[in-house]
Amino acid sequence: MPRSLKKGPFIDIKLEKRILDMNSKGEKKVIKTWSRSSMISPDFVGHTVAVHNGKNHVPVYVGDNMVGHKLGEFAPTRSFRGHAGGGKAEKGGSAPRKK
């Protein structure tokens, strides 16, 4: 369920302050954050934010099409490596044919 419009978007105060300071200075550094629930505002465009995925920080370059989404959407927390590969059937079918 989406957040109520009267409340406004959640953006971590310290993260927003760091972005605004960098915008005023014209700097482009990677910013580490643990705030996956922060909404991406138009001020974030052009910056790289390293979002924590539970194990390490994933660098996310913020583009203009990401505005309105949350930072955590771009740093996956689960890695799927495929199903177990054992017990593969012989080539040519599983059961012998009847004549």
UniProtKB/Swiss-Prot annotation:
Which InterPro entries does the record cross-reference, listed alphabetically? Answer: Ribosomal_uS19, Ribosomal_uS19_bac-type, Ribosomal_uS19_CS, Ribosomal_uS19_SF
Q: Which Pfam families match?
A: Ribosomal_S19
The record's GO CC annotations read:
cytoplasm; small ribosomal subunit
Q: Which GO terms describe its biological process?
A: ribosomal small subunit assembly; translation
The record's region (Disordered) falls at 76-99
Taxonomically, the superkingdom here is Bacteria
A Gene Ontology MF term for this entry? Answer: structural constituent of ribosome
Q: Does the keyword DNA repair apply?
A: no
**Swiss-Prot/TrEMBL keywords:** Ribonucleoprotein, Ribosomal protein, RNA-binding, rRNA-binding
What family is it from?
Belongs to the universal ribosomal protein uS19 family.
Q: What does this protein do?
A: Protein S19 forms a complex with S13 that binds strongly to the 16S ribosomal RNA.
In Swiss-Prot or TrEMBL terms, this protein is called: Small ribosomal subunit protein uS19
Name its species: Pelodictyon phaeoclathratiforme (strain DSM 5477 / BU-1)
Q: What is the lineage of its organism?
A: Bacteria, Pseudomonadati, Chlorobiota, Chlorobiia, Chlorobiales
Q: Which gene encodes it?
A: rpsS
